[in-house]
Swiss-Prot record:
Belongs to the universal ribosomal protein uL14 family. It comes from the Bacteria. GO terms for biological process: translation. SMART domains: Ribosomal_L14 (SM01374). Transmembrane segments: none annotated. The keyword RNA-binding applies. Pfam families: Ribosomal_L14 (PF00238). This is Large ribosomal subunit protein uL14. NCBIfam families: rplN_bact.
Amino acid sequence: MIQMQSKLDVADNTGARSVMCIKVLGGSKRRYASIGDIIKVTVKDAAPRGRVKKGDVYNAVVVRTAKGVRRPDGSLVKFDNNAAVLLNNKLEPIGTRIFGPVTRELRSERFMKIVSLAPEVL
């Protein structure tokens, strides 16, 4: 469950290390985002020669949450951290590599590129 002011790690090679959620997209009263949801983030920590710099605002998709996601068979998939992948205005990933596992819930028409770049799909 990601809400405004939540800090997330970045799971791609854009150069951003951590981001902060500034808005959960999808309705004016929407409070929480989970895996597969799009959020608006600002870069809080960035590598010196990365593609993004501190203070930039981007869209991002949540790929891992500590809260986890419940599957129809009753199993629960949790992670140690909250992580996101930065997106451009066309909702395509900015980075060319994804670090760490992602969940099968991202296998929609929108995020197949992220699933194909990920080293492991749970």
